[in-house]
Amino acid sequence: MGKREEMIKEIKELMLQPERIRNMGIAAHIDHGKTTLSDNLLAGAGMISEELAGKQLVLDFDEQEQARGITINAANVSMIHEYGDQKYLVNLIDTPGHVDFGGDVTRAMRAIDGAIIVVDAVEGVMPQTETVLRQALREYVKPVLFINKVDRLIKELKLNPQQMQERFVRVITDVNRLIRKYAPAEFKNKWLVNVNDGSVAFGSAYYNWALSVPYMKKTGVSFKDIIDLTNAGDLKTLRKKAPLHVVVLDMVVRHLPNPVEAQKYRIPHLWRGEIESEIGQSMASCNPKGKMVMVVTKIIIDKHAGEVATGRVWSGTVKTGQEVHIITAKRKARIQQVGIYMGPERINMEAVPAGNIVAVTGLRDAMAGETVAEEPIEPFEALHYTSEPVVTVAIEAKNVKDLPRLIEALRQLAKEDPTLHVKIDEETGQHLLSGMGELHLEVKLVHLKEQWGVDVDVSEPIVVYRESITKQSPIVEGKSPNKHNRFYIVVEPMPDEIYQAIREGEIPEGRPKDTKVVAKKLAELGMDYEIARGIVDIYNGNMFLDNTKGLQYLNEVMDLLVDGFHQAMDEGPLAREPVMKVIVRLVDAKIHEDNVHRGPAQIYPAIRTAIHCAMMKSNPVLYEPYQKVVINVPYEYMGSVSREMNQRRGQLIDMRQEGEVMIIISEAPVAEMFGFAGAIRGATSGRALWSTEHAGFKRVPTELAINIIRQIRQRKGLNPNPPTEKDICPQQ
C-alpha cells in the first residue's frame, strides 16, 4: 500500500507547480496503437503491472471497449515521470481514433496543450491522422510524433536500416506537410517535428520499446542493436535497453508546453471574452489565486458518485463546496467532490488549482463543452465537431413501464455526448437518436441496456438528409394568422466559402456578439458589406439577416423571428429534414403596435411559412451525407473492392500502391454504406483494412430525389407526394 500512498503524495505536491505539469493526449488513426501506447506508458510510470500492459488496455475500462478493442471514451490518467533530476506530473487523455467517436477527440483537445500523434510505420499517415491533427492544431495543441509498429518493418517487411530510414522520412514529411497546412500562422515553422531534436520517436508500443535520437546519443543504443534483438526475439533485453515510457515521456516533458506557457497563446484563441480583463489575465497566466474558471470536457456516470464531470482548470482553484455558475445553462451549482485521476481511479482532494485536469461532482446541469466559473463570464468558444449526426434510429421501450427510465437515460446520453442528438417524434411517440455512424449508435444502445437496464426495439438505421436551394427567391410575404403582421423575406443559397467558414468555426454559430466583426468577415468572403451588417443569427449552417430600415417594434419581435427561423431550418418544406446553406433576409415588415397581437402564436407561423414558401420558389433540392472510405487491400482483391464500391454509388478519388498493399480512397453516400463491414470482409476474404470518415453533404441526383422524398414523408406519416409550391405557399 506504501507505494500508492507515496504516489498520491507526489501527485499532490506536483499539481501545485504548473511548470512541472504536462497536459497531453494521444491521437491517431484507428488501430495505429494508441491505447497500447497509453497502457505501456502507465506501466512504465508504475500505474499498472508491466506484464499486463498492452494486453490489459487500462484506458479501455468500459467493458464494450475491451470487447471491441477500440477506444470509445476519452479517459484521463495522471502519472509521474522523472526527467533530468526533476519529477513531472503528466496528465494523459486517451482519445478514440474511430471516426464515429470524433466528438470525444474534439472535446479532449480542449483540455490538453500537447499531443503525441501516433502513426503506424507500415500504413503511414491515414485520413483519420489528418483529421485528428487538424483538430489538435485548430485548438492550438502542439504535436510530437511517435512512429509505431516498427517491429513490423523488421519482421514482416524485412527492411534494412537504410530502407527503414526512408520509410520514417516519408512519415515525418507527411506529418510536417499537415502541420504547415493546418497550424496557426505563428507556429507553422516552430511546431514542425524533427528527428534530431527528439520531437520524433519510433518504436513498438506492443513490445514496449522506443528510440529517439537524443536517447541514442545518451545511451549509445543503435538501430542495429534494435534490429538484432528483434530478429533474435530477445524482447526483455530490448525493453531494458530502450524502454518505451522513458523515451516517449522524455519527449513529452521536453517538447510539449506546460500550462503556464500554453495558456498565454491558447486563451486568446479559445476564449471570446476581453483578454485585458482581470479574469482574462488570470486565465492567460494560469493564476491559481484568480477567480475559478474550468471547462468541462467529459461527463461520465459513476455507479456510486453519480455524474462526474472531468475538465481543465484554466484559472483559480476548484474547491469542495464552492458555489459556481454553469454559464451556458444559466444555472448555479455547488461543487460536491473534487478529485484528480490516477489511472482510471479518482483520488479525492480538497482543492485542485489552475493548470490541472480535475474531476468534480455536483454539476447536474453541465454538458460536455460547458464553461463553469465562480462568477458569470463570457463562455469559451463552442466546441467544433468535425462531423455531424448523419444516421438516425427510432427506439421504443419494449416494456411501457421502462419509459420514464428510457427518457432519463437518453437525456443522460445526450449530456455525456453532445454529438448525439435525441428527439421525440411527436406523432409516433418514438425517440429518435441521431449519431455519427452505425458504430456510434450501436455502442450507445448497448450502454442503454447495460447501464440503465432498458430493453428497446430499434428500427433499421435511417440516413439524415438535408434540404437546400439553388437560386434566389423573389420577395415573399408571410402573414400572421390574425393578418395584423406581415413579413417580407428573400432566401438565397449560401456561398460555399461562407458555409465552410461557419463549419470550421471561423464564423461562430449563434447570435454574434459583435456584428461588425462578423460582417467584415462575411464581406471578405464576398458578401455585400451593407447586407452583411444585418447579421442577426447563424444556425446549423444557415443565416438570418435583418436588412430592413428603421422599423418600429421590430426589436420587440426579433427573438420570436429568430425562434421561427430556427423552426423553419429544423424542418424544411420538402420532407421536414434539416435545412443547410440557406441565407434568409428580412427586407421589410408591418408589425402591429399592440404586443397582444404579436405574440408567438402570430409571429412563428408568419415567418416560418414565408421562409418555406420562398424556399419552394428557389428550386429546393435534397442533399445526402457522404463518407470518405479508405480501404487497404492486397493487390489481388482490388477488383472485388472496386465492384463493391461501384454498387454503392461510390466515386474513386485516389489509388496508390505501397509494397504489396493497394490503398483505395473513394467517397460514397452514407445511405449506401449500411452493411458495408460484412460485405467488404466477404469480398476480400477478411483481408481488407478500412476506415470511414464524414465527407460532408452532396446533392442527391434528381432521378433519385423524388423517391427518397417519398420514402421520408411516408416514414414521417405525411402525404408521400412531394409538396408543390401551391401546397406550401398560402393563397394570397
UniProtKB/Swiss-Prot annotation:
One GO term describing the cellular component: cytosol
Record CDD domains: aeEF2_snRNP_like_IV, EF2, EF2_II, EF2_snRNP_III, Elongation_Factor_C
Superkingdom of origin organism: Archaea
Annotated keywords: Cytoplasm, Elongation factor, GTP-binding, Nucleotide-binding, Protein biosynthesis
Subcellular location: Cytoplasm
Major localization class: cytoplasm
Pfam families: EFG_C (PF00679), EFG_III (PF14492), EFG_IV (PF03764), GTP_EFTU (PF00009), GTP_EFTU_D2 (PF03144)
Ligand binding (GTP): 28-35, 94-98, 148-151
Keyword presence, Phosphoprotein: no
Molecular function as annotated in GO: GTP binding; GTPase activity; translation elongation factor activity
InterPro entries noted in UniProt: EFG_II, EFG_III/V, EFG_V-like, EFTu-like_2, G_TR_CS, P-loop_NTPase, Ribosomal_Su5_D2-typ_SF, Ribsml_uS5_D2-typ_fold_subgr
Keyword Cytoplasm: yes
Sequence ranges assigned to domain tr-type G in this UniProt record: 19-230
Modified residues (Diphthamide): 597
PANTHER family: ELONGATION FACTOR-LIKE GTPASE 1 (PTHR42908:SF3), TRANSLATION ELONGATION FACTOR-RELATED (PTHR42908)
Xref: HAMAP family: EF_G_EF_2_A
Family: Belongs to the TRAFAC class translation factor GTPase superfamily. Classic translation factor GTPase family. EF-G/EF-2 subfamily.
Role, per record: Catalyzes the GTP-dependent ribosomal translocation step during translation elongation. During this step, the ribosome changes from the pre-translocational (PRE) to the post-translocational (POST) state as the newly formed A-site-bound peptidyl-tRNA and P-site-bound deacylated tRNA move to the P and E sites, respectively. Catalyzes the coordinated movement of the two tRNA molecules, the mRNA and conformational changes in the ribosome.
Name of this chain's protein: Elongation factor 2
